[in-house]
């Protein structure tokens, strides 16, 4: 997570200390905490041709949905309740959540229980579709009201229920794979696309569940295609989209990059007084339109 998202590179000088710190932290945690997965009792799902084809087809769909989700997160982060509205917005937002929660109590909390149910195949098509639509909406509703909270688990749970729903629908045409397997693939794909970090997404789903090793190839296919589609749309992530002054999306940076655009080269340029201002988001397209 630190290397791929915060540092933006998986170079050896970063990976070695990161892995060493992770190993020490894990060994220390084993002394005081139970040595079990975050999501318990997840079956060891197996690879199937049906699941593989579904992953290739569902990846782009999940990527488009993730891109829309990222833009929604970005918009609401820049239009949060302020001033007098900040006193009443949380009451209204959580009141709405409470009413919806009468029918869908799975929406309460960060989504951990919702994801766990999806991973074990709990829930029918209608319920999973409803949750996959409502969870992002209540997340941005609470975020826009001024409430603080992380986005990792809500995003993972949304991908899980969405993957489960699409998988149940797929099973009507090509049965053979359990809904929980589709949920795990969907969770990895949406997390990878939303964070713009496919390696992190794959590793986290495997480690949080201690399962899914038979699904690595479908997970990889869905996660890579979903991340690529979301990247092509604008390249933002759920983290960069929330920044007060957003940098250009990675896609626009790469498409307009100079030969010295790498982080290491940029640091060298800054040291020698050669730093350049990055292009504003959309500046390239505006210049192109202005020029005809």
Identify what each model region corresponds to.
Residues 1-292:
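Alpha-helical transmembrane segments and immediately membrane-proximal extracytoplasmic
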């Amino acid at each position: 997570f630190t290397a791929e998202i915060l540092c933006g590179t998986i170079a050896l000088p970063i990976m070695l200390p990161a892995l060493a710190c992770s190993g020490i932290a894990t060994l220390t945690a084993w002394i005081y905490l139970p040595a079990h997965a975050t999501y318990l009792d997840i079956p060891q799902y197996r690879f199937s041709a049906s699941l593989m084809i579904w992953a290739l087809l569902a990846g782009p769909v999940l990527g488009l949905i993730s891109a829309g989700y990222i833009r929604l997160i970005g918009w609401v982060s820049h239009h949060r309740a302020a001033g007098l509205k900040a006193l009443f917005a949380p009451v209204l937002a959580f009141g709405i959540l409470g009413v919806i929660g009468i029918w869908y109590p799975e929406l309460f909390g960060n989504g951990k229980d919702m994801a766990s149910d999806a991973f074990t195949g709990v829930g029918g098509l209608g319920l999973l579709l409803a949750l996959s639509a409502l969870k992002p909406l209540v997340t941005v509703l609470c975020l826009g009201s001024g409430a603080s909270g992380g986005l990792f688990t809500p995003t993972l749970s949304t991908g899980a229920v969405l993957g489960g729903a699409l998988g149940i629908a797929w099973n009507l045409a090509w049965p053979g794979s359990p809904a929980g397997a589709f949920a795990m693939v969907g969770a990895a794909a949406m997390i990878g696309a939303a964070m713009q970090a496919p390696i992190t997404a794959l590793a986290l789903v495997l480690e949080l569940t201690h399962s899914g090793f038979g699904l690595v190839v479908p997970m990889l296919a869905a996660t890579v295609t979903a991340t690529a589609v979301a990247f092509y749309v604008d390249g933002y992530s759920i983290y960069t989209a929330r920044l007060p002054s957003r940098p250009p999306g990675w896609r626009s940076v790469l498409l307009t990059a100079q030969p010295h655009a790498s982080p290491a080269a940029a640091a060298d340029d800054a040291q020698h007084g050669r730093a350049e201002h990055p292009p504003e988001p959309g500046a390239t397209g505006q210049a192109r339109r202005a020029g005809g």
